[in-house]
């Protein structure tokens, strides 16, 4: 059967353009070596099957031959090794991308996105498992996702990694050294990972897609050096350098401080893609004029977080104003609004910036952030408050800021259980997995005159969405109230 599965895989490679006809024998021999097998019998014609099914059979065969431990982490390491037998080398990929880019940047990214799926670097069959829905809110239509495509940490792999000497190569999952890396129990295989080198702000950066695709064409742009995240004038220059090269993509950066930043603060990187987030659709509700920057349209966006939108035909003018706003905000304290630039020498104010091209104008959204903590809010005053942690307690990073909730995988099972308990009128507090949701359910359930098997799913989706709106409102340094707007304008007046 091994010969049949190998033939199916190489036929898939030819069908998707990964493998030229003249390399089929070469790929077959590489695959045989992965299985420590010496001979191959051509099975003749084979049926066309989904990649997931072919890989499953190959992995089962490898387990049978005791070539790998049967767990998700080790199966992922092994199937990436198999797919690399079909994947063109980096120079070929870069050359194809450049050739297409010279004709049309969109054509280049379309090709590379498809390529990243065909190599199984983006595992399409896992992405499909993600639960996604939209909800209406006072701020427009928001996206809610429960992320199921990122594999849970594998206990066997973690235990094995603990026993082995600590490895510090690659330094992190964003480093250039990941390209071609076989991976290990605690680090994903990246043999099929291909990086497109790009130049931004006169320095070498890389362009890739996120293997977990939280939204369409979710890309990552990262420094070739392992250097920490830092929001500064150069950040705005880099964002616009990228948008000028790929005007059909938006690009943003996580903030550079804990709590309000993303999960990786140690490696300078941005995230972007081809998706219109709710925040981009949100209108400017109040325009302001900044002295000396009359040529830059400036305004407060109707959004739960505190957003200043700048737009102009000249990106350099936006960069100058953004730098002025950033420097002012870094040092800004307003006790009445509970904004403190620093306490005990620890800085609190930073910005989450997002750049895009809209028609003939360049646009930059500056989201004001502050990571101060108090006894009442030990995880952050401008962070989801404790009563919302049953749904979301993780950092509110760039993707959430723009209106897309990335909720933890645990919610899938918890919502299924809640549904059952609500429909069967069972006491939620008796189940330790879902007792944390009890007071929330008690609060919203009375507002629905009828709850049945037909509408329970939508009710839970709506209510989870309402919690996400509150999460975003908690993260806003200036609330969407009359006082909040006055406080916001007081800051803008200092500019």
Residue ranges of predicted features:
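Active-site microenvironments that recognize anionic phosphate/pyrophosphate groups
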Residues: 1-221, 225-228, 302-304, 318-322, ...
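Catalytic or ion-translocation cores adjacent to nucleophile or general acid/base/metal-coordination motifs
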Residues: 234, 243-263, 272-324, 330-333
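Beta-rich nucleic-acid/ligand-interaction surfaces
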Residues: 258-266, 344-350
């Amino acid at each position: 059967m091994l010969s049949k599965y190998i033939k199916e895989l190489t036929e898939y490679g030819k069908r998707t353009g990964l493998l030229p006809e003249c390399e089929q024998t070469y790929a077959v021999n590489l695959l045989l070596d992965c299985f420590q097998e010496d001979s191959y019998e051509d099975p003749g014609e084979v049926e066309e099957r989904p990649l997931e099914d072919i890989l499953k059979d190959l992995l089962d065969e490898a387990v049978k031959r005791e070539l790998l431990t049967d767990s998700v982490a080790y199966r992922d390491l092994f199937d990436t090794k198999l797919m690399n037998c079909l994947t063109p080398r980096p120079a070929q990929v870069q050359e194809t991308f450049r050739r297409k880019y010279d004709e049309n940047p969109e054509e280049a990214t379309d090709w590379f996105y498809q390529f990243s799926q065909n190599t199984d670097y983006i595992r399409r069959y896992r992405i499909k498992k993600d639960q996604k829905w939209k909800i209406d809110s006072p701020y427009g239509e928001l996206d809610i996702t429960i992320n199921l495509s990122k594999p849970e940490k594998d206990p066997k792999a973690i235990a094995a990694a603990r026993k082995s000497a600590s490895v510090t190569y690659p330094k992190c999952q964003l480093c250039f050294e990941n390209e071609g890396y076989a991976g290990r129990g605690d680090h994903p295989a990246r043999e099929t990972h291909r990086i497109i080198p790009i130049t931004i702000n006169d320095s070498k950066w890389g362009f890739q897609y996120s293997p977990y695709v939280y939204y369409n064409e979710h890309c990552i742009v990262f420094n070739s050096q392992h250097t920490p995240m830092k929001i500064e004038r150069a950040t705005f220059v880099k964002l616009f350098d990228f948008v000028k090269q790929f005007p059909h993509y938006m690009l943003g950066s996580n903030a550079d401080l804990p709590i309000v930043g993303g999960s990786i603060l140690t490696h300078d990187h941005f995230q972007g893609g081809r998706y219109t987030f709710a925040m981009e659709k949100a209108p400017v509700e109040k325009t302001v004029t900044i002295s000396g920057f009359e040529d830059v349209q400036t305004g407060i966006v109707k959004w739960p977080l505190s957003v200043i939108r700048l737009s102009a035909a000249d990106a350099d003018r936006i960069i100058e104003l953004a730098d002025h706003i950033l420097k002012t905000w870094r040092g800004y304290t307003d006790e009445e609004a509970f904004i403190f630039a620093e306490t005990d020498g620890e800085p609190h104010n930073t910005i989450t910036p997002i750049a895009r091209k809209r028609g003939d104008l360049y646009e930059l959204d500056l989201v004001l952030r502050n990571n101060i903590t108090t006894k009442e809010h030990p995880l952050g005053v401008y962070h989801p408050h404790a009563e919302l942690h049953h749904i979301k307690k993780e950092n509110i990073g760039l993707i959430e800021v723009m209106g897309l909730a990335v909720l933890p995988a645990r919610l899938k099972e918890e919502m299924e259980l809640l549904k059952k308990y609500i429909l069967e009128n069972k006491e939620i507090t008796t189940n330790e997995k879902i007792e944390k949701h009890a007071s929330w359910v008690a609060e919203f359930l009375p507002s629905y005159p009828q709850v049945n098997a037909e509408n329970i799913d939508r009710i839970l989706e709506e209510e989870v969405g309402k919690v996400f709106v509150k999460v975003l409102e908690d993260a806003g340094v200036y609330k969407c109230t009359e006082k909040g707007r006055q406080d916001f304008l007081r800051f803008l007046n200092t500019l």
